[in-house]
C-alpha cells in the first residue's frame, strides 16, 4: 500500500503518519524530518536548505525531487509507505509519477489557518524518541517527562515564530492548492477534517484505507 498525506504545516500529517504506518507495518517517510536531518549536517547543501527554511520559503523542486527519489527507490520501501508532505506542487507530482507507477491513495488534511498557527507555535517533541507534544493541547502527563521513554530533554523548533508560520501557510496555499485540484480527479483523493482530535482523525483515515 502506498499512501500520500497532504496538508499545510501543522495539519497533523506527522502524528497520523506515525500512527497509521505502525498499525499497517509500513515505513513513515516524513519529508520535513528528512530535511531537518540534512540541516544538522555541516554541508553546503545543509546551509542552503536552512536558509530557505528560516525565511519560510519552500525548498526548490530540484532539490526536493532528487532527495525523495533517492529515498523511495530504496529496496526497503518496495512494499509501500506512508509519504508525508510530498509532493507539494504540480511539478513535484509529475516528477513523482515519472518513477512511481503504482496506484496511490491521497489523503488531504483540511485545517483552518488559526488552528494551524496555534498547533505549530505550541509544538515540541521529545529529543530521545520523537514523541510530539503541544503546550496548548497535549502536554506530558508529568511535567518535563516524556510519556513514552521518560526522557526530560525536549526539542523546540527554532524556525517556528508566528510571522514565519503565516508565510509558510500562504506559500503552501499558493503552491499546493492547484495540486489539490489536480488530485481531486484521480479517483483516489480523500479529505479528512484535520480540526478533529487525534483519535477521530485516525478513525477517519482507517476507514479510508479500510484497516481496523
Curated annotation (Swiss-Prot):
GO cellular component, one term: cytoplasm
Residue segments, region LID: 122-160
Main location group: cytoplasm
Domain of life where this protein originates: Bacteria
Enzyme Commission identifier(s): 2.7.4.3
Disulphide connectivity of cysteines: none
GO biological process terms on file: AMP salvage
SUPFAM superfamilies associated with the record: P-loop containing nucleoside triphosphate hydrolases
InterPro entries in the record: Adenyl_kin_sub, Adenylat/UMP-CMP_kin, Adenylat_kinase_CS, Adenylate_kinase_lid-dom, P-loop_NTPase
GO MF, one example: zinc ion binding
Residues noted as binding ATP in the record, renumbered to the chain: 10-15, 123, 132-133, 196
Keyword Nucleotide-binding: yes
UniProt keyword annotation of ATP-binding present: yes
Residues the entry annotates as binding AMP: 36, 57-59, 85-88, 92, 157, 168
Swiss-Prot/TrEMBL keywords: ATP-binding, Cytoplasm, Kinase, Metal-binding, Nucleotide biosynthesis, Nucleotide-binding, Transferase, Zinc
Subcellular location: Cytoplasm
NCBIfam families: adk, PRK00279.2-1
Free-text comment about domains: Consists of three domains, a large central CORE domain and two small peripheral domains, NMPbind and LID, which undergo movements during catalysis. The LID domain closes over the site of phosphoryl transfer upon ATP binding. Assembling and dissambling the active center during each catalytic cycle provides an effective means to prevent ATP hydrolysis. Some bacteria have evolved a zinc-coordinating structure that stabilizes the LID domain.
HAMAP family in UniProt: Adenylate_kinase_Adk
Subunit-level organization: Monomer.
Protein name (database record): Adenylate kinase
Organism (species): Rickettsia conorii (strain ATCC VR-613 / Malish 7)
Taxonomic lineage: Bacteria, Pseudomonadati, Pseudomonadota, Alphaproteobacteria, Rickettsiales
Amino acid at each position: 500500500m502506498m499512501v500520500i498525506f497532504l496538508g499545510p504545516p501543522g495539519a497533523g500529517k506527522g502524528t497520523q503518519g506515525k500512527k497509521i504506518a505502525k498499525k499497517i507495518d509500513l515505513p513513515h517517510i516524513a519529508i520535513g524530518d528528512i530535511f531537518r536531518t540534512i540541516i544538522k549536517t555541516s554541508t553546503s547543501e545543509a546551509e542552503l536548505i536552512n536558509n530557505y527554511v528560516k525565511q519560510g520559503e519552500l525548498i526548490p523542486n530540484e532539490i526536493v525531487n532528487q532527495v525523495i527519489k533517492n529515498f523511495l527507490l530504496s529496496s526497503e520501501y518496495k512494499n509501500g509507505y506512508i509519504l508525508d508532505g510530498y509532493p507539494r506542487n504540480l511539478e513535484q507530482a509529475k516528477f513523482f509519477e515519472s518513477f512511481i507507477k503504482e496506484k496511490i491513495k491521497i489523503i488531504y488534511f483540511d485545517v483552518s489557518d488559526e488552528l494551524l498557527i496555534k498547533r505549530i507555535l505550541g509544538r515540541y517533541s521529545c529529543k530521545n524518541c520523537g514523541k510530539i507534544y503541544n503546550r496548548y493541547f497535549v502536554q506530558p502527563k508529568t511535567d518535563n517527562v516524556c510519556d513514552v521513554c521518560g526522557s526530560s530533554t525536549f526539542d523546540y523548533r527554532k524556525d517556528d515564530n508566528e510571522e514565519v508560520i503565516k508565510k509558510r501557510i500562504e506559500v503552501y496555499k499558493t503552491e499546493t492548492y492547484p495540486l489539490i485540484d489536480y488530485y481531486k480527479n484521480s479517483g483516489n483523493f480523500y479529505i479528512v477534517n484535520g480540526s478533529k482530535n487525534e483519535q477521530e482523525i485516525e478513525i477517519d483515515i482507517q476507514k479510508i484505507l479500510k484497516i481496523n
